[in-house]
Amino acid sequence: MRERIPGIIRQTAASIESIPVAEKQAYDALAQCIGENGPVEDHTDSTLLGELFRVKLARSCRQGLHWHAISWWLAENYEYFLLDALHASLKRPDQPDDLFWYLKKRGLEGALPLFADCAAPLVDAASQTTALTPALFRLALLRNLWGNKADLSMSGGVVSQKELKSDSANLLLLDDIDAVYEYYCRERVTAVTIMADNTGFEVLCDFLLAALLLHFNAALCITYVVKAAPVFVSDVTLPDVDITLNAMAASSSGCLLSSCSSLALQWIASTLREARQAGRFVPVASSFLCTAEPGWNMPLSLAELLDRQGQQGLLISKGDANYRRLLGDLHWPYDTAPKAVLEYLPCAVLVMRTMKSNVNIGISEEQQTRAAQFDAKWDCSGKVGMIQFYHWRVCNNHNNCRSRTRSPPASPPSCTPSPGPSSG
């Protein structure tokens, strides 16, 4: 809160073309208030998103709390609500509605040629087989996982090309790829919901995975859930979906791409557009994913979507913020069994994230030791990844079935709100 969040606010203001001095000062004032632990003020409105913040903000204001005293999860999400409101009040007619548009545009332009080189071999492999093989499934998930490193909210708006493309300096701590592939094939999954995370390189990886799944499974429908408002700098919103698809489809005009790479991008874009026309690829926006609410408080519309998927469904949760939401942003003991927390979900869940906060479950002491030997800040550095699969009808040994419960998990006494990244 002292450095990273104020830095993001100032970086965002600096990215706005021809920003007047008065506008820049308004952004600076918000950054200074948060960085210097100013009082929390209730600026919620009558919008759905404002209503979702109202109770928590009213409670904080009644208690006279300052920015560094409220939970990090609330502070971080509310900060983006205030940023959006500030942008809306200052926006000129020639400016985009998304205040992070300039940063996102730069990120997409840099990511396209790098992603195309990574995607071309997978698209080529898909053209040479009639079924989604375990090897191709694994490659697609790994590409998708490490694409999560491209998070502008953690980097202050800058992600290096080397970081986007390299997998060699990373550690895959939890690898449930074989388990989810077995479930996907055995249950003949027909419905997948993807909770999206970042634009740029990561959304390109999402689209690659979605295109491959749709290509090999004619009965499959994918719901792609994005944020209803711009948050966390690079998070995907509905306009970003078409912006990205258009950029991929127009890739032949880019002189930096080989014909093979360009064709791969065009195949992904055309596959998703055709699926979208047929109602098999459906992007939807969620205000709930822009709030500090825990997963077990998800609105009925989202809960019913997952409930309808049932035994033939799969929820894919992308990134750190969505994972924190599923766990209520509580600091569970790292070796907590996933079933103790995730039983409220009505369908199977696959988590793919690079670890950027100390909110984790399902990590044994042995795995924690291994991770610490790899990186002293392994749970916050973004260099350690997890592909974690859980289903309420499957125990850890993937044998015995049991009944599920839709009630919130019971927090153990040692379970506390997450203090946020060590970098502050």
Features from the language model and the residues they span:
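Non-catalytic accessory regions outside enzyme or core folds
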Residues: 1-191, 388-396, 410, 415, ...
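Structural motif
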Residues: 191-193, 313-314
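C-terminal functional extensions of proteins
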Residues: 226-228, 234-424
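Residues at the starts of beta-strands that form the adenosine-phosphate
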Residues: 190-191, 219-223, 348
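Secondary-structure-rich domain cores
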Residues: 186, 190-192, 201, 211
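Gly/Ser/Thr-rich loops at beta-strand to alpha-helix junctions
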Residues: 72-74, 195-205, 229-231, 320-325
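Histidine-anchored nucleotide/phosphate-binding helix
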Residues: 202-223
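Short, glycine/acidic-enriched capping/hinge loops at junctions between secondary-structure elements
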Residues: 17, 204-207, 363
